[in-house]
Amino acid sequence: GSVVASYPYDDSPTHRLTGVYSKSADDEVFKYLAKAYASHHPIMRTGKPNCPGEEAETFPDGITNGAQWYDVEGGMQDYNYVWANCFEITLELSCCKYPPTSELPKEWENNRESLLAFIEKV
C-alpha cells in the first residue's frame, strides 16, 4: 500500500517495471483531478507516505503517473480510459491494504474533504 493519487497511463510502451512517464492525451486533466484529491488529504498532500519498507518513497504533490511509479499492463484504469472514455484515477489510501476496523473512522476523516473536493471537480 501507499498514500497517493495515481493517474493514467499505468502501462508504458516499453513495459519497464518503473520510471517511465506514460502520458495520456488528457494528462493535464488527470493531474488536475489527482491534485484535487491529494491536496485535501493530510498525508497524501505531503508527498511522503512513509510506509514501512518504503520510507524513501516520495510523490510530488501526492500524485504520480501510474507507469512512472510501476508499470501495470492491462489494468482497468487504462482500459476504461481507452475503450470507454472514462476518466479514472487510482487512490492508494493507506500503507496497510486492509486496515483494522478501529482505524476506519480515522481513514474517513483523512479522506472526507478529499472526496468532496474531487466530487466538486467531476
Language-model features, listed with the residues they occupy:
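Metallocarboxypeptidase
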Residues: 1-122
